[in-house]
């Protein structure tokens, strides 16, 4: 076999070839457009790029929920309420009593199973409907199972009552135009005091405090989010709204624009769903489709991110089609835990990932974009004056 003579020149050519290959491989491995870059994590990379000219979108895939992510550098933090003047009780799972504004008030505290003292969790405030109470929300909302599986703390207030002036209608929570500012402030202070005591005694994620209400509880939630947007990260309004008939209007949330879910149970004829989400008590006829759309108008004008959900079952418990293994309202809790306080106005991880699988098909990002639920399978009808 013929073999080329071994020379210094050939050694030099071989060395240059090896150097060229090494250079090409090196350049290719650092190509930022290469899909396999995810296989080479950079553990020392900063957790926030808020100072960069074009910051990356929030990532809800690296963590189960965005509220699990580390607090970004220079993140905007919520205001923190002062401790109640009468002090805090020793909080425990179950019923708790507190003195707020000189009155004795109560609430349920739900902790997840195996809650460790060092575990930092989001807090969800849950406001019940007219015919229900705090325990009804706990049971029908499957809140304990949800807290165990999704890892959050829940505070379920007990209502003091709120009667519409000139009627005997007790809406449980103050939201109507006959409620004086002093009554509204009393309920806002109750929220402040519950939150302050939770912050004092529990390791809570202060950037992930949300308010969620159903029917009358949603109507109050929609007032609370305006009054305490400097403390609340997000909201979920399930058959709520503003401005219709006797409901107080939308006046805005100020500098912080909390993202929210706006859900209702139908627009009625002549719309395609054929059912109307209406509370026809004492001839007042509050229409939650009108009230919800009125709130959407205010939210859009002010620059909030919203998810709109429309079902076709009227004023009943939402017919949420939850994936197997998850609690009934898992998608609503998930929304709250994916929208921390530090998100910029109008920002959401859902704009990058789309809605999660737990969210009903009749929900969509943005006002007017949802396709109403169709078909049967609605929950049993309830007395609209009781739900």
Where are these regions (language model features)?
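N-terminal secretory signal peptides that target proteins for export/translocation
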Residues: 1-14
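Serine-hydrolase catalytic machinery in alpha/beta-hydrolase-like enzymes
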Residues: 89, 100-108, 119-207
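A domain-start/cap signature at the N-terminus of enzymes
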Residues: 33-34, 41-43, 49, 53-123, ...
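Structural recognition of the beta-strand scaffold that forms the well-ordered cores
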Residues: 107-108, 123-127, 152-158, 208-213, ...
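Sec-dependent signal peptide recognition
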Residues: 13-21
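The feature captures the conserved acid-bearing segment of alpha/beta-hydrolase catalytic domains
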Residues: 230-322, 327-330
